Amino acid sequence: MPHDDAACSAEECTVTVSGGSMGGLFTGVALDRAGHDVAVFEQSAGELRSRGGGIVAQRSVRSFLSRHTAVTPQHVTTTTSERRFLTADGDVRTATSDSMTFTSWDAVYRALRDAFPDDRYHTGRRVTDVTPATAAATFADGSERSADLLVAAEGGRSSTREQLFPDVSPEFADYVAWRGVVPESDLSADVADAFDDRFTFYQGTGSLILAYFIPGPDGGIDPGDRRLNWVWYDTLAGRDRGQLFTDASGTEQRFGVPPGKLRAPVERRQRDRASTALPPTFAAVVAATDEPFVQAIYDLTTPSMVVDRACLLGDAAFVARPHTAAGTAKAAEDAVELASALDDHDTLTAALAAWGRDRTDAGSRLVERGKRMGDDRLGLGG
């Protein structure tokens, strides 16, 4: 199509997607299904590893899987019927009926990856520069690609966002999330039973831990085949952030330390703290975790998701605190709404203007909601 003044709905848009993880695949699949000519470029050379474990499977995520992939959501999700808060001794403080649905990063990634054509998913291709006016991308190897539309779905560390908005950067929220997953088979029967069919929490001073079952590494959702996903939000409480985020190789990381890379003294100190600061069942879960990891909690707000014929999608534009349980859902919604906007408007300019306005507003509201939730739960609001 001519780049701007023809209807994207009438002819194919050529689309370059930078980023082949969750946001990029939501985009690639949604636009491919809408009839556009999409190519996805992922900087990693091989298949992506799981980057976080559990996901709350919001309705928009389940709907996307049902409509656009071969996966039936019920086959890749777990459910709970009760939300439970524990006391420090492990007794039940409150229990309320609350139906929740969960899945795992790897289950959703596999479904999306299988739904997108192999010949248009390119690994080892890192975008290093973009020209928004022409939707052109330059890669690390010096090659270039022009398209009608460029979508940067590169996550919270997006280099494209840094180029388009150099004054925008993530703001540290003054606390971290320790995380891990444990095969159900590694838990005692009593501990596994304590978390079965329950979304379980414990709130301490400047601390909040939660846990729920997710599909196993091969997608198993039957008892015994699952994994228990846990997240422990924790204020730094005087600890040195630089020391905490220095990995086993001695490199200081800005956003966190991945599984298997924690320094032994840091990991040992947090495990020791778990044994005294958490209820017995949660302490047992942390003790059974092979490779816990830690991530910094950040807030990120971008003034606009659209610059000319380039747009930012998902965490590349907005990072809300995980308490919202909406990061994956927002990426799916961004992608679906982008496909709808291209179909509903006569020109690319009009489509991007409408989409950018609506999704920027949604992202801003989500970030603010995450701030309120996190500050309230961690006692940081003053």
Regions found by a protein language model. Name each.
Residues 1-14:
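Extreme N-terminal leader/targeting segments of oxidoreductases
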Residues 17-33, 37-39, 44, 151-152, ...:
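Conserved mid-domain beta->alpha element of the FAD-binding
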Residues 44-115:
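Active-site-adjacent segment of FAD-dependent monooxygenases/related oxidoreductases
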Residues 51-52, 68-69, 164, 324, ...:
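Short, flexible helix/strand-to-coil boundary loops that buttress conserved ligand/catalytic motifs
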